[in-house]
Amino acid sequence: MKNKFLATLFLACSISTVSAQTPVYMDDAQPIEARVKDALSRMTLEEKVALCHAQSKFSSAGVPRLGIPELWMSDGPHGVRAEINWNDWGYANWTNDSITAFPALTCLAATWNPDMSAKYGKAIGEEARYREKDVLLGPGVNIYRTPMNGRNFEYMGEDPYLASVMCVPYIQELQKNGVAACVKHYALNNQELWRGHIDVNLSDRALHEIYLPAFKAAVEEGGAWSIMGAYNKIRGQHACHNDFTLNKILKDDWKFDGCVITDWGGAHDTYEAAVNGLDIEMGSYTNGLTSESVFTYNDYYLASPYLQMLKDGKVPMSTIDDKASRILRLIFRTAMNRQKPYGSVATEEHYAAAREIGNEGIVLLKNAPVVKKGAPLLPIDAAKYQNILVVGDNAVRLLNQGGGSSELKVKDMVSPLDGLRAAYGDKVAYAKGYAAGRPMYGRADEIPQNVVDSLRAEAVEMAKKADLVVLVGGLNKNHFQDCEGGDRLEYGLPFGQDELIEALLGVNKNLVLVLLSGNAVEMPWVSRVPAIVQGWYLGSMGGKSLADILSGAVNPSGKLPFSFPAKLTDCGAHAFDELSYPGDSIKQEYKEDILVGYRWHDTKKIPALFPFGHGLSYTTFTYGKPVASAKAMAADGTLTVTVAVKNTGSIAGKEIVQLYVGDDKCSVLRPVKELKHFAKVGLAPGEEKSVTFTLTPDDLKFYDEASAAWKYEPGKFKAYVCASSADVRGVVSFEMQ
């Protein structure tokens, strides 16, 4: 008994001694700030600097001497990219890095449903965690300024409020997995052409009202742990080390406590990188290393050159302590977070999430009868149509491939053709119809004319015998389409699709057009195509989502997150000279100012072909007369707007009720109206619900350049209850005191 007592006493003392010897920075029970301070105090200058730059293509160093691990990053934002080689862009060809491809963020934004954003963030976070990633490079929240931008498919549309609301749940749920969101590309990376050096100039109003709100929401509401700088310059200084946007706005005004990470190759100057707010430098020189004998990671701007400047007193020591503190904070939140879950990949839950997001994001643009007074063409009645012809390269193309850094290696991919065959069986035949080339980066295949002609002729012959034709076309992830590193060359459909559509209409009027893209396209045939569906890039379960909508198994409820101009010059960015878009290759001016998207269409009275917020359903909805809670709002008060919405059709559906606000008279130019609130409401047939929105004085403010502050001017305002930006269902006037 005595020996047992002594052993127990010895064990207790040993545990106590070990506990007492545990450094603060290694103690999970300690606050993160205490751990950061303790770790920093133990580090040498060289160890601090080593944190600030890459050690491989997708990792940055830890502090091995102190047991602090490295940070591992991965491209996103709609799937975890396959493993990349240590020193180059080649794939490592692992056998266990296949994942779920989730719908692109344009599709997520088109759901207008924050619950879908949360579901998305949770699922992609679990996959990133399973793949042992600490930082996921996403979501992207750059504003849709022009339909020519090759990277719009990665973003959340043209409206800053919609993008703000939709990015926050994604970030919050992602980070619950111990994986940092790296919100990108901060800021004004609104085109791919000349992205590495184009110098963007714009008003402070446009910056604060249009281009920054989603980033601000990501930081202040979403609690994002990292931000990725953009490639472009802003007012003469590169965005990855821009004093105004990083130090003044992000870190001082928004109190951001996370890390600023370059886009790969986005750093250009050691002094600016040291003092202007950059924390981690990735991918410098040729966007990485040409070979280890030519460049080493120690040659990066924030590596040996920075260390030498610190030793020479050319930059303050406070800069490295701030950077190292932020990086340590990120490491404690992610790589050293022992409470994080294990994660999972390509699960049935993730596939279900991808399918549901796709179902809610697909937008029914048009659904007309083929014959006068007949029924709309969609949904496709299996009993009515015995011979369904599916046409189009996009019906079978793997759209997870190409696109640049968002390219994904999937475990499963259901194509549109597969999805439609699962729904309609042997009634479905297929013709390619057009050729689109390979998904190469930096160049595009040239398709021989004889191939174009033969594929079109085959499709037309088969269409003559079909009861109904479903053309699955649009853009793809090839260069000069929806792809990083270059912008589109034309607003119209590529690969001869306009001619194909005309030819198919010439032999079969029962034509359903499905557009898979992340951008608007010109539609010279729009009045003659009875049914048009915007299908986005839908990911692993895309074919099932598309079949769900086309068959009527799911009622479409998505609405557009950006406007479809009838022609390119109807878009504000393209209504001026080339200095507005694409710039003169050196400089660029955002001449449309705050009038982006529907703000331009409304204010200039230029109707969009399909307006922001537009989307049809297989049922119908009626709106009652909106009622305000008061005739005036006090400076410290609120005002509610309530409207009844009823499903007057025969099937259940979801309607997205939108509330916009307009200022009747102001000393500065303001848009006719701006989106301030929305709600997605599910209604059974015949069901009616009341939807209430609460307005505050903040909803009425504009950014005043003279005072560099948000303000409103007392006076008369209008609240517009809308089914889209162009479909106003009711207006309420009120006064702001």
Go through the PLM ranges and name each one.
Residues M1-P23:
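Bacterial Sec-dependent N-terminal signal peptides
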Residues T17-F702, A709-A726:
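Glycoside hydrolase catalytic-domain context in secreted enzymes
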Residues D727-Q737:
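Short beta-strand elements
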